[in-house]
Amino acid sequence: MEPAPSAGAELQPPLFANASDAYPSACPSAGANASGPPGARSASSLALAIAITALYSAVCAVGLLGNVLVMFGIVRYTKMKTATNIYIFNLALADALATSTLPFQSAKYLMETWPFGELLCKAVLSIDYYNMFTSIFTLTMMSVDRYIAVCHPVKALDFRTPAKAKLINICIWVLASGVGVPIMVMAVTRPRDGAVVCMLQFPSPSWYWDTVTKICVFLFAFVVPILIITVCYGLMLLRLRSVRLLSGSKEKDRSLRRITRMVLVVVGAFVVCWAPIHIFVIVWTLVDIDRRDPLVVAALHLCIALGYANSSLNPVLYAFLDENFKRCFRQLCRKPCGRPDPSSFSRAREATARERVTACTPSDGPGGGAAA
C-alpha cells in the first residue's frame, strides 16, 4: 500500500546523522512542543538538547584531535607510510570531517532552528554521507588488503604499495561522490513552524525516492560491504588456522596477525556503532511507529550519536592496538612545534624490533611498499 503524501511531502528528511532535521514538528524533543504555542519547549526537549550538545562536544574534541594526530603522524614519519596506514589516513580524514560538523548540529539542537544558511546546510549533509560511504568503503578495502597480505603474500608484494593505496583512496572518494554530490544538490533550507529546517528535497514522488534512497544506502553502505568483510576474514581465519608460519619469519607473522587483528577490531567497532542507526532508519521507513513517542525519539538520537562516536573511537583504538601509532602520538606530544627527532624515534623503534615488526618498521626498506 502506497503511503499518501502529506502536505509539504516534497521536503523529505536526510537519511542518517541529520535525520532529526526532518522531524522538528514531528518529534517533540527536536523541536517545539507539539501541544504548546509556537516557541514553547518542553523540559524533556531541552534536557535532550543539552545532553546531545554535551555528547557532541566531547566527540568533536576527541575526534578532531585524535584524527588530526593520526593524519599528521602518518604524513610526518616516513616509516608510517605503509599501505595499511594510507587507508587509515583516509579513514581519519573522513572521521575528522564528520566530527567538524558537530558544533553546527549542537547549535541547531539548542536553538531549534538552522541559523547557518543553505551553503553550510549543503556542506554538513553531504559530509555526513561522504563520511558514511568513505568509511565503510575504506574498511572494506582494508579487509581486502589484509586478506591479500595473509592469503596471497607473493601477490601482496605488487598490490600492497602506498602508491596503489593512495590511488584506491582517490577512487573511494570519487565513488562516494556518486552519493555525496546529489545530496549536496538536494540539501535545502526551508521555513517550518517558525523555524528554519536543513533537509533534503527529493524529486517527485518524494516518498518513493526517499524510501529507495534509504534502502539503497542500507544495502550498499552497510549490508554488502559487511558481507565482503566477513568473507575476507573468514578466508583469513581458515588460512591462519591451517598454516603455522605465513611469511617464513616469526616476527613478520606477529606483525601480520597483530595488524589483521587491529583492522578487525576497527571494523567491529564500526559495525557496532553504525548498525543501530541503519536498522533504525529502515524500521522508521517501513514500519508504522509512533514518531512522537519520547522513547522512539530518544532512541533515534542515541543511534545518531553512536554513529558519530565511532569517528572519535578509531584514534583511541589505533593508540591501544598499534605500538607505532602509540610511539608517534607520544613523539608528537613531546615536540608539537619542533621537527621530529629521528634518533629518538629510531631508538624507540629499535627497542622493540626484536619483539615485533610493525607498520612503522616495514620489511622492504624506507618506502614501506609492501609492509604489513
Swiss-Prot record:
It is a multi-pass membrane protein. GO terms for molecular function: G protein-coupled enkephalin receptor activity; G protein-coupled opioid receptor activity; neuropeptide binding; receptor serine/threonine kinase binding. The keyword rRNA processing does not apply. GO terms for cellular component: axon terminus; dendrite membrane; neuron projection; neuronal dense core vesicle; plasma membrane; postsynaptic density membrane; presynaptic membrane; spine apparatus. N-glycosylated. Ubiquitinated. A basal ubiquitination seems not to be related to degradation. Ubiquitination is increased upon formation of OPRM1:OPRD1 oligomers leading to proteasomal degradation; the ubiquitination is diminished by RTP4. A lipid is attached at C333 (S-palmitoyl cysteine). Keywords: Cell membrane, Disulfide bond, G-protein coupled receptor, Glycoprotein, Lipoprotein, Membrane, Palmitate, Receptor, Transducer, Transmembrane, Transmembrane helix, Ubl conjugation. InterPro entries: Delta_opi_rcpt (IPR000321), GPCR_Rhodpsn (IPR000276), GPCR_Rhodpsn_7TM (IPR017452), Opioid_rcpt (IPR001418). The chain crosses the membrane at residues 48-75, 86-110, 123-144, 164-186, 207-238, 262-284, 300-321. The keyword Membrane applies. Residues 347-357 have a biased composition (Basic and acidic residues). This is Delta-type opioid receptor. It comes from Homo sapiens (Human).
